Amino acid sequence: MVPAAGRRPPRVMRLLGWWQVLLWVLGLPVRGVEVAEESGRLWSEEQPAHPLQVGAVYLGEEELLHDPMGQDRAAEEANAVLGLDTQGDHMVMLSVIPGEAEDKVSSEPSGVTCGAGGAEDSRCNVRESLFSLDGAGAHFPDREEEYYTEPEVAESDAAPTEDSNNTESLKSPKVNCEERNITGLENFTLKILNMSQDLMDFLNPNGSDCTLVLFYTPWCRFSASLAPHFNSLPRAFPALHFLALDASQHSSLSTRFGTVAVPNILLFQGAKPMARFNHTDRTLETLKIFIFNQTGIEAKKNVVVTQADQIGPLPSTLIKSVDWLLVFSLFFLISFIMYATIRTESIRWLIPGQEQEHVE
């Protein structure tokens, strides 16, 4: 029993030794996990400054290319400019372009100049490289103002151009009209052509005098509303001729001069049509402007539409008359429908008889 008791302490010691080895082996993974977590935490803390550190390294390598002798000095100057020595400047470096970095640059002494080489030269290179983006960003608004003009300025510039074009068109008339001799003439009225009269008989093909011709119809309300204004034109322009004709009675002339709708106003020089009035607002003032722009002849002042112009010679009220062409068209259409109906009924009666004869 004594030897067994004497052997127990070495066995216990061996068990304790193996237990310590086992604990040490099992503790390695746990310690590795702790080291990994600690390294990951440190890496995450240092991650925000990573782009700036890479940029600083890049700038340091660029300086080494320019100045191989001053590697350590350039690195120190770069760290001093970037503010990597103090922990309070990390937020400044995170906003390099706007804000605090500009304040930091402005707070530095302005007496530092960029010399040709040395420590000051490397510092200037680092600063210029770091804040080149800031300088470029400051020039973007200037470029935008240079290439893009404001709408108000563009409109104000276009207005004088339009005015100049109008003045040029007014100074140089498109149609050179020979003014007629009005000596001894007191009554200036509009002449209306009847069905037997031809327009070419009133136009001089060998002359350069101008005539304003109106194509109208008495049943058109637009022609009736234009009539008083057109009746007053001979008094405003006594040097010109004014004619009016019923387009329904002179269909050949309407087709010849492209009258597809009434009222239609054409300006003739001799026997040649030169201009057409295309404005929807048909008043005395717009007609004056049209004639002046085309011929350069100014209208007489104080000429307005009077009560006599409402009466004639061109009627200003709708004339109700029978349109025989419309009556004939309706009669032909009704006759054709009746004839087609009768023929259809007779065909229906004939078809059963033909079938019966065919069976027999």
UniProtKB/Swiss-Prot annotation:
Gene3D superfamilies (alphabetical): Glutaredoxin
Q: Where in the cell is it found?
A: Cell projection, Cilium membrane
Q: Please give the GO cellular component terms listed in this UniProt entry.
A: ciliary membrane; cilium
Where is the region Disordered? 141-173
Q: Which domain of life is it from?
A: Eukaryota
Q: Which residues lie on this side of the membrane: Extracellular?
A: 33-321
Residue stretches making up the Thioredoxin domain: 153-296
Signal peptide residue numbers: 1-32
Q: Which residue windows are transmembrane per the record?
A: 322-342
Asked if the record carries the keyword Iron-sulfur, the reply is: no
**InterPro entries, alphabetized:** Thioredoxin-like_sf, Thioredoxin_domain, TXNDC15
Which keywords label this protein?
Answer: Cell membrane, Cell projection, Ciliopathy, Cilium biogenesis/degradation, Disease variant, Glycoprotein, Meckel syndrome, Membrane, Signal, Transmembrane, Transmembrane helix
Give the consequence of mutating L212P.
Answer: In MKS14; uncertain significance
Record membrane topology = Single-pass type I membrane protein
Regions of compositional bias (Acidic residues) in chain numbering:
143-155
The record's annotation in Pfam families points to: Thioredoxin
Read off the SUPFAM superfamilies from this record: Thioredoxin-like
Q: Which disease is it linked to?
A: Meckel syndrome 14: A form of Meckel syndrome, an autosomal recessive disorder characterized by a combination of renal cysts and variably associated features including developmental anomalies of the central nervous system (typically encephalocele), hepatic ductal dysplasia and cysts, and polydactyly. Death occurs in the prenatal or perinatal period.
Q: By its UniProt entry, which PANTHER family does this protein fall under?
A: THIOREDOXIN DOMAIN-CONTAINING PROTEIN 15
The name this protein goes by in its record: Thioredoxin domain-containing protein 15
Q: Which gene encodes it?
A: TXNDC15
